A protein has these predicted regions:
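A structural signal for short secondary-structure junctions
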Residues: 1, 257, 271, 297-302
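Generic C-terminus detector
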Residues: 298-359
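Short, surface-exposed beta-strand/loop "edge" segments at domain boundaries and coil↔beta transitions
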Residues: 13-16, 38, 270-277, 313-319
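C-terminal accessory "lid"/substrate-recognition subdomains
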Residues: 36-40, 114, 131, 138-294, ...
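Nucleotide-state-sensitive switch-loop elements of NTP-binding domains
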Residues: 2-133
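Alpha-helical scaffold elements adjacent to nucleotide-binding pockets in ATP/GTP-utilizing enzyme cores
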Residues: 100-107, 156, 175-179, 322
Length: 359
């Protein structure tokens, strides 16, 4: 089986350096870059154990993601027929959708009786010298902003390669890392050397899990964030097995959302005792949806919430205390559970709108 290592977002400014660095350790590399003329959309180059193949694919009006993923998949199929097994690095330029690549590969493999390839790692490479500017670029007209692709790539990746990390000040580098954490707190960071080599081999990178439910969120690309450098962002986890009062949690959101970069988890509300609510927030927007209904008479669930907070503005102890105040008190737990469903729920409309829209 071919093990595929996908790298997203490499700009042409340091693509050549990164490619040369990878060639020192990898035998097969396929990379794409935007063509410099109007005849084709993408140029590609395949390094296959010393043999070099070059060409151009697509047309000016084609979708970059569609063209590159189809060509990459067919190329990998040819390599599998040639070698049977091995590793290949596939490098996609900026403005290629990371989820579109993985979805296409998985769908194509599902249609086969025998799998021939597996996505082993997914990473994003970024330029530290321009990252804080790129991440705030807004869209022009109907075109997607570069920042949107950065959000999607960083969140979808398990690791990020930092190019030009030694060409900015230590304070600026910490700012880059802090903003990366605000977008994806679980991503692992690795420095690219000046010659494009990594400090570890690709086989040592975090393994890609296509089924991970936190791998992608539309909120990430729909929300425009302002990088908070020096905000001392911190990842915290809150748990409880007591149902929550919906009105008090709504108040918590009103009072704290501006200091929470991202939150994800499952919540258990007293007025929806036979469901958990899937919760997510990013920047200043949130999304929630009812999960599967339990049929059992006796029900017990857990509130589980992962938050990335601006600890310079509000400590984790205060956030924990605010969340604990959303829980049912002992006297409320002793009340008639049949009345809980009638509790005021300012967030109910958000769930209904999501369900009615079919999202």
């Amino acid at each position: 089986m071919i093990q595929v290592h996908v790298i997203h977002g490499i700009s042409q400014l340091f693509l050549e350096t990164t490619k040369n660095g990878l060639l020192k350790k990898q035998q097969i590399i396929l990379y794409y870059e935007k063509a410099f003329d109007d005849s084709n959309l993408l140029d590609f180059e395949l390094f296959d154990n010393g043999e070099i193949s070059k060409g151009s694919i697509g047309k000016p009006d084609d979708c970059i993601s569609c063209v590159s993923r189809s060509h990459a998949y067919n190329t990998i199929c040819d390599l599998q027929s040639k070698y049977g097994a091995g590793d290949i690095v596939v490098i996609f330029p900026a403005y290629v959708e990371p989820r579109a690549i993985a979805d296409y590969f998985v769908i194509m493999e599902d249609d086969r009786e025998i799998m021939i390839m597996d996505i082993r790692t997914v990473s994003t490479a970024l330029d530290c010298m321009s990252f804080l500017r790129d991440v705030t670029v807004e869209k022009l007209g109907e075109e997607m902003a570069k920042s949107e692709f950065l959000y999607r790539s960083i969140e979808y990746s398990d690791s990020v390669f930092l190019a030009n990390h030694n060409r900015i000040s230590p304070v600026s580098l910490e700012g880059v890392k802090e903003v990366l954490c605000q977008i994806n707190s679980m991503v692992e960071l690795f420095d690219l050397s000046d010659d494009g080599t990594l400090p570890i081999s690709l086989s040592e990178l975090p393994i890609f899990n296509f089924e991970d439910p936190t791998r992608f969120s539309p909120l990430t690309s729909e929300s425009q964030i302002t990088p908070y450098v020096g905000a001392q962002s911190e990842r915290i986890v809150w748990r409880s097995i007591t149902p929550m009062h919906p009105e008090r949690f709504s108040r918590f959101i009103d009072e704290n959302l501006e200091v929470i970069f991202r939150s994800r988890g499952n919540l258990w509300f007293a007025n929806c005792i036979q469901n958990q609510i899937g919760w997510e927030s990013f920047a200043n927007v949130f999304s929630m949806d009812r999960l599967d209904t339990w049929e059992a008479i006796e029900i017990s669930a857990e509130n589980y919430l992962v938050l990335i907070i601006q600890s310079s503005r509000k400590s984790k102890e205060v956030i924990f205390a605010d969340l604990d105040s959303c829980l049912f008190t002992a006297s409320e737990l002793a009340s008639d559970a049949s009345t809980w469903i009638q509790l005021p729920d300012p967030l109910y409309e958000a769930i209904q709108q999501r369900q009615e829209s079919g999202e």
